[in-house]
Amino acid sequence: MSQTTATPTSTARFAPAALAQAVVAATLLAAAAGTVGAQDSTAHPSVLSRFEFVVSSGALLPTGDQRDALKSAKMTIAQLSYAVRPYLAVTTSMGWARSRDVAMTDAPKLDVFTYDVGAELRADRWLSGKALTFTPFAGAGAGGRSYNYRSLDVDATHNLAAYGSAGGELGYRRIRFRLEARDYVTGFKPMMANGASGRRNDVSVMAGFRITAH
């Protein structure tokens, strides 16, 4: 494969349909949470802190055409959540994946940054009152995706992104183990050459621990 000459790139346009779908999904999650808010809340004691912070490790797994541009990579993601209600949380995330541009000669190192905000709908806690519990959840959100070469003098590109997620949190006393998978749809523009903007897909899988106050 021949070396591509670096040229400045501009922000890729993102198909508005994907972003609209994420907003609609988040709205539906909030509406669903409102209908279950009157249910018995013993699975979610009011003494629980509304704020939750976890740093997770995982992997960014390109799918489809994205596999021709990115190498699967280790990923670190920081998440801050606020429990608006026992069944609904607002979650902000910042992720960093250490990938490579496999479309170029020598596959230069490429930092992939993902940042977003979304809504998370949580089901009743299974085995409530027991030492070991499990809480499944599903969510959706939108934000941005940036690509930046670590050692090449090339401008970073920035794109809109949307995701759907599913996962669960396993609890033992004050320890929580969170496992989550996210399916991302993002805008994409070739980083080192002129070309048409497109839409790409990848999956993030992450796991992390946190300690609760009670």
Language-model region placement:
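Cleavable N-terminal export/targeting peptides
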Residues: 1-48, 214
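Predominantly the C-terminal beta-signal and adjacent terminal strand-loop region
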Residues: 99, 109-112, 171-214
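A mature extracytoplasmic/lumenal domain signature
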Residues: 57, 94-96, 183
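Short glycine/proline- and aromatic-enriched beta-strand/turn motifs that initiate or cap beta-hairpins
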Residues: 34-82, 90, 142, 206-214
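Gram-negative (and chloroplast) outer-membrane scaffold detector with strong preference
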Residues: 39-41, 79-152, 159, 210-214
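Outer-membrane beta-barrel proteins
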Residues: 64-67, 101-105, 147-151, 177, ...
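Transmembrane beta-strands of outer-membrane beta-barrel proteins
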Residues: 49-55, 86, 90-92, 115-117, ...
